[in-house]
C-alpha cells in the first residue's frame, strides 16, 4: 500500500484514475466472453442489460453525484492544472480511513505537496447567523492551480536539467518558513544561472540552536524528482569541483532582478564552475518573468514535501483535530524573541515587560527598525503582534463560537501557560501539538524547532479557519498554500483599524462585532490578484501567475 501511495504522489504521474462511472459501465456493459478462440477474430456481441440494471445504475449515479474527485495533470516539463473540489460529501467517512488513503482519493498524483482534509463547516443546529458566517468558506471563483510554462522555458530547462559543469551551493538560514523561501529562490537562481543546484545547506539557527539538515525536514528524493525537468539537483558536489577554499557571496542587495544575478555571477560561475551564496532571505525580486514565478510555485507547493516522519505525525495530529469537527488554527507570535525584536509589550503585566525591556537593552541588535517609534505608536501602526486579550476579542467579534476547537500554532509563549489564560477563559477548547500528541510522539523533535513548525504547518493547513496574530513568513506561506488548494478561509487581522475600536469604551460589544466583521469582509481568503502590486510575493498571492480560472463556480455553502 505504501508503495502505491508514493506512486500516486509522484507529480510526474499524469494518468487519471477511472471514475466510479467507469467501473459501473464495466459492470453492466462488459461484452460476452466466448470460450472458443475462433470468436476472437469476430466482432464482440454485447448483451443488452435488463431494465432493472438501468434503474440500479441511475440510483448508484445519484449516490456518486455528490462526490468530486480532484483531477490533476502535470506535463513533466511544463504544465500543471488542478481541480480543487472540497469533496465535502466524503467528510463523514474520513475518520476511519488513513490520511494517505484520503489523499489518494482526493488528490491524484500529488496535486500539491500538502492537500488538506475537506473543510467541515459548522452545524446548523443552535448556531447564530454570525457563527454560520464565521465557518463559511470563501468563493474560490473557479481558480485552480495551472502551471503552463512557455516553449522558451521548456527549451532552456531541458538544457539546465542536464547541467554538469556549473554548480550552485546555497546556505539558508532562519526559521522553517524563511528556509522554505530561500530554497524556493535558490532553485530560481539556479535556473537563471543555468547551474546545477546542490541540495541547500541549512545553517544552524542562532535563536533556537536547531541543527536540522535538509533531509531532516524535507523529502530529498521527492524534491529532486519533482524538479528534474527544471533544474538538475545533486546531493553533493562532484570531486572535480571540491576546493580547499571557496569565496562565499553574501553581500546581495535587496530586490535583485534576474538580469542583475546573471551580470554579477554568471561569468564567475562559468570560469570557476562553483558559486556559493549566503544570505538570500528576501533578496530576489518579487516581480519576476511569468515562467520564474511559476517555478516558484512549483517548488513551494509541489517540490518541498516534508520528510515522511514529520508528514506522518502531522497527519496524525490533523486527523485528531479534524475528527472532532471544524477547527480554527491560530498562529500566535508570543515567543520571547518576538517581543524583543518588535519593541512591543506583552500584555502580561509590568513584571514580564521589564524582562523584555532588559533583554532588549542588553541585545539591541535584535530590535527591528523604526527605532524612533514608541510602543503605542508601534502598536497602533500594526507593527506589534496581537496579544491574547486582543485575539480573544477579535475571535468573539468575528462570530467564532465559544465552544470552537482552536489549534495553537507557534513556539513556546513567553510567560508559559499564563500567557494563554485570557484566551482560554473565552474559548475553553484550546489545543497545542503538545496536548494533542500521544506520549513520546514529539520526543524525536526535542530542540528541533523547524520540525515542530512543520507539524504546526500541516495541522494548520487543514483548519477551517486560519488566523495569524502577526504577519510574517508563516502567515504568507499559509495564505498562499490555502489559496493554492482551493482558497480555504484565511483572515488577516486589520490591526490598524480594529485596535482603536477595541480601545474605544463607547463602542459596545454588538457594535464592535458588526464593525469588526465589516472590516474583515474582504479578508476571508478570497482570490486576490498579485498583478499591479510589485511588493506581493507569488507564494502568498498565486493568482494569476500560478492559478487560472477554468469555469465559473458558485459559492458552496455549508448550511
Curated annotation (Swiss-Prot):
Major enzyme class: transferase
UniProt subcellular location: Membrane
Glycan-bearing residues: 126, 372, 403, 447, 504
InterPro entries per record: FucosylTrfase_pln, GDP-Fuc_O-FucTrfase
Pfam families found in the cross-reference section: O-FucT
Keyword Cell inner membrane set for record: no
One GO cellular component term noted in the UniProt record for this chain: membrane
Keywords: Carbohydrate metabolism, Fucose metabolism, Glycoprotein, Glycosyltransferase, Membrane, Signal-anchor, Transferase, Transmembrane, Transmembrane helix
Amino-acid positions noted as binding substrate in the UniProt annotation, renumbered to this chain: 331-333
Membrane topology recorded in Swiss-Prot or TrEMBL: Single-pass type II membrane protein
Transmembrane annotation, as ranges: 53-73
Primary location: membrane
EC number: 2.4.1.-
Pathway assigned to this chain's UniProt record: Glycan metabolism
Molecular function as annotated in GO: glycosyltransferase activity
One Gene Ontology biological process: fucose metabolic process
Family of this protein: Belongs to the glycosyltransferase GT106 family.
UniProt protein name: O-fucosyltransferase 37
Amino acid at each position: 500500500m505504501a508503495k502505491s501511495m508514493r506512486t500516486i504522489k509522484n507529480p510526474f504521474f499524469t494518468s487519471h484514475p477511472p471514475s466510479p462511472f467507469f467501473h459501473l459501465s464495466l459492470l453492466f456493459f462488459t461484452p460476452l466472453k466466448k470460450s472458443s478462440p475462433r470468436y476472437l477474430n469476430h466482432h464482440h456481441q454485447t448483451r443488452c442489460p435488463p431494465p432493472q440494471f438501468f434503474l440500479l445504475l441511475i440510483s448508484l449515479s445519484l449516490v456518486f453525484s455528490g462526490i468530486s474527485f480532484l483531477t490533476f495533470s502535470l506535463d513533466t516539463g511544463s504544465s500543471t492544472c488542478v481541480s480543487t473540489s472540497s469533496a465535502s460529501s466524503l467528510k463523514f467517512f474520513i475518520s476511519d480511513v488513513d490520511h494517505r488513503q484520503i489523499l489518494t482519493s482526493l488528490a491524484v498524483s500529488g496535486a500539491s505537496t500538502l492537500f488538506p482534509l475537506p473543510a467541515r463547516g459548522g452545524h446548523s443546529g443552535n448556531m447564530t447567523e454570525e457563527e454560520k458566517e464565521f465557518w463559511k468558506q470563501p468563493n474560490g471563483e473557479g481558480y485552480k492551480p495551472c502551471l503552463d510554462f512557455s516553449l522558451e522555458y521548456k527549451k532552456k530547462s531541458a538544457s539546465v536539467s542536464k547541467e554538469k559543469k556549473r554548480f550552485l551551493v546555497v546556505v539558508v538560514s532562519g526559521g522553517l518558513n524563511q528556509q522554505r523561501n530561500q530554497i524556493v529562490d535558490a532553485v530560481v537562481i539556479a535556473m537563471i544561472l543555468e547551474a546545477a543546484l546542490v541540495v541547500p545547506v541549512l545553517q544552524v539557527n542562532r535563536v533556537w540552536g536547531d541543527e536540522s539538515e535538509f533531509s531532516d525536514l524535507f523529502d530529498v528524493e521527492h524534491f529532486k524528482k519533482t524538479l528534474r525537468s527544471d533544474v538538475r539537483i545533486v546531493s553533493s558536489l562532484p570531486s572535480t569541483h571540491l576546493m580547499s577554499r571557496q569565496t562565499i557571496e553574501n553581500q546581495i542587495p535587496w530586490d535583485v532582478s534576474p538580469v542583475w544575478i546573471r551580470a554579477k555571477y554568471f561569468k564567475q560561475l562559468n570560469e570557476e564552475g562553483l558559486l556559493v551564496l549566503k544570505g538570500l532571505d528576501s533578496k530576489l525580486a518579487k516581480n519576476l518573468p511569468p515562467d520564474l514565478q511559476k517555478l516558484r510555485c512549483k517548488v513551494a507547493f509541489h517540490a518541498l514535501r516534508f520528510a515522511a516522519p514529520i508528514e506522518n505525525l502531522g497527519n496524525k495530529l490533523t486527523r485528531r483535530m479534524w475528527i472532532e469537527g471544524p477547527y480554527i488554527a491560530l498562529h500566535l507570535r508570543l515567543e520571547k524573541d518576538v517581543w524583543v525584536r518588535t519593541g512591543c509589550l506583552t500584555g502580561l503585566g509590568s513584571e514580564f515587560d521589564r524582562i523584555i525591556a532588559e533583554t532588549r537593552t542588553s541585545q539591541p541588535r535584535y530590535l527591528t527598525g523604526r527605532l524612533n517609534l514608541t510602543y503605542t505608536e508601534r502598536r497602533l501602526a500594526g507593527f506589534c503582534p496581537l496579544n491574547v486579550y486582543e485575539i480573544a476579542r477579535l475571535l468573539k467579534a468575528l462570530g467564532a463560537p465559544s465552544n470552537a476547537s482552536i489549534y495553537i500554532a507557534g513556539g513556546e509563549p513567553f510567560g508559559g501557560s499564563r500567557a494563554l489564560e485570557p484566551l482560554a477563559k473565552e474559548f475553553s477548547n484550546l489545543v497545542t501539538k503538545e496536548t494533542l500528541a500521544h506520549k513520546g510522539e514529539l520526543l524525536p523533535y526535542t530542540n528541533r524547532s523547524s520540525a515542530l513548525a512543520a507539524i504546526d504547518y500541516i495541522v494548520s493547513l487543514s483548519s477551517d479557519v486560519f488566523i495569524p496574530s502577526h504577519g510574517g513568513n508563516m502567515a504568507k506561506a499559509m495564505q498562499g498554500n490555502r489559496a493554492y488548494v482551493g482558497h480555504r478561509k484565511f483572515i488577516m487581522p486589520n490591526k490598524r483599524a480594529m485596535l482603536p475600536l477595541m480601545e474605544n469604551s463607547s463602542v459596545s460589544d454588538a457594535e464592535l462585532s458588526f464593525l469588526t466583521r465589516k472590516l474583515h469582509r474582504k479578508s476571508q481568503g478570497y482570490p486576490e490578484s498579485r498583478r499591479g502590486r510589485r511588493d506581493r510575493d507569488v507564494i502568498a498571492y498565486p493568482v494569476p501567475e500560478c492559478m487560472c480560472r477554468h469555469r465559473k463556480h458558485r459559492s458552496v455553502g455549508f448550511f
